[in-house]
């Protein structure tokens, strides 16, 4: 699950849609292991923040099971593992290959990708998943904080439209954004 925030933020009380989806999946007996991917950095500044908050520091009551120079995997529970990475902004394909490698090492079996983070879409085929779900909580091309990434986001959204098996949207306006495709479903919060 590619998140739009870091597990450490959830551990400190931040709550958002992907946190609630993760908790629902964790409580379902038919769901196996979950690899929660922390917000992947798009800039050097964010990579430094992720390094400090997620690679150096540890989530309370977690166990670090693997640590590298640019990544770390923490075990939160028998079902939930958290992958933190600072490499994505410079080498997204390398970061995605590392995520795939980690899923294999942890014996995840058939992968289902559930992403809240549009920037991974051009690279998600590297993972070899059986099913791809994109959960759109907003149109990020309209956010001022992503103005410098607008072209990249537009390409990512085209990739999502063309390659996601399922697309969930939080608002009816996003149905139009995804061209009212038959694989797009409105799933409001709550």
For the regions a protein language model found, what residue spans apply to each?
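N-terminal subdomain of nucleotide-sugar transferases
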Residues: 1-61
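Carbohydrate-associated surface elements
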Residues: 173, 187-190
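An aromatic- and histidine-rich active-site surface loop
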Residues: 19, 91-96, 112-128
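A conserved catalytic-core segment of Leloir-type glycosyltransferases
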Residues: 42-106
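Membrane-proximal helix-turn-helix segments that form the acceptor-binding/catalytic region
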Residues: 100-102, 148-167
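Active-site proximal beta-strand in glycosyltransferases
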Residues: 1, 114, 125-141
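Alpha-helix capping/helix-boundary segments
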Residues: 119-120, 173-175
